[in-house]
């Protein structure tokens, strides 16, 4: 099983003994990590080798998510007001904004800079845009990022997901 929700990982691991076949849990934390792990599956490799390679692939993914605050809240001492744009890095709120485009580009830029400072390269950025965003909106984000990161392969996918304006995979 490729689990992408950290709240479900423990339950999935506890269910292993109940299965009527051999089951392994790959504890991914975000949708892009799960997708990348699945894409690295090799039908010719054994289970252990696949677990190693799929885990390695998932661990190389940074995830940016842009959504909105559904209510007033306080996260880590930061006041968040209902309706504000939220920037999440690997599931954690790292900023707020009033403009979706600005929040998205700034978030990706910060993640790319952090990856480069820590020795992780950036070869691919995949922009998955949600039901509230048009293809033209996503193209503007892509174009802004392409202007900053020449040589990085940037693709767009209409994910149609609710709640998140953008889910972005950076690897």
Language-model segments: which ranges?
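Short, small-residue-biased leader/transition segments that mark boundaries at the very start
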Residues: 1-3
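Short flexible coil/turn linkers enriched for glycine and charged/polar residues
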Residues: 19, 29, 118-122, 160-162
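Short gly/pro/ser/thr-enriched loop/turn and capping motifs at secondary-structure boundaries
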Residues: 6-9, 29-35, 162-163
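Glycine-rich phosphate/diphosphate-binding loops and the adjacent beta-loop-alpha structural elements
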Residues: 79-102, 107-144, 167-171
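C-terminal edge-of-domain segments
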Residues: 155-171
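Polyanionic, low-complexity intrinsically disordered segments
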Residues: 18, 23-25, 143-148, 152-156
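Short Gly/Thr/Asp-enriched flexible loops that form oxyanion-binding sites at enzyme active sites
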Residues: 7-19, 137-142
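Internal, active-site/partner-interface "lid" segment
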Residues: 19-22, 26-108
């Amino acid at each position: 099983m490729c689990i992408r929700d950290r709240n479900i990982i423990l339950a999935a691991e506890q269910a292993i003994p109940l299965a009527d076949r051999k089951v392994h849990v790959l504890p991914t934390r975000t949708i892009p990590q799960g997708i990348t792990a699945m894409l690295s599956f090799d039908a010719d490799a054994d289970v252990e080798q696949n677990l190693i390679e799929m885990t390695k692939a998932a661990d190389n993914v940074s995830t940016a998510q842009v959504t909105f605050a559904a209510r007033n809240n306080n996260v880590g001492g930061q006041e968040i007001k209902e309706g504000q744009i939220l920037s999440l890095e690997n599931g954690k709120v790292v900023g707020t904004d009033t403009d979706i485009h600005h929040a998205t580009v700034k978030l990706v830029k910060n993640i790319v800079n952090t990856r480069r400072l820590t020795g992780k390269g950036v070869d691919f950025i995949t922009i998955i845009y949600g039901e509230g965003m048009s293809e033209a909106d996503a193209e503007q984000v892509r174009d802004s990022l392409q202007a900053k990161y020449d040589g990085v392969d940037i693709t767009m996918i209409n994910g149609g997901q609710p709640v998140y304006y953008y889910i972005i995979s950076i690897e």
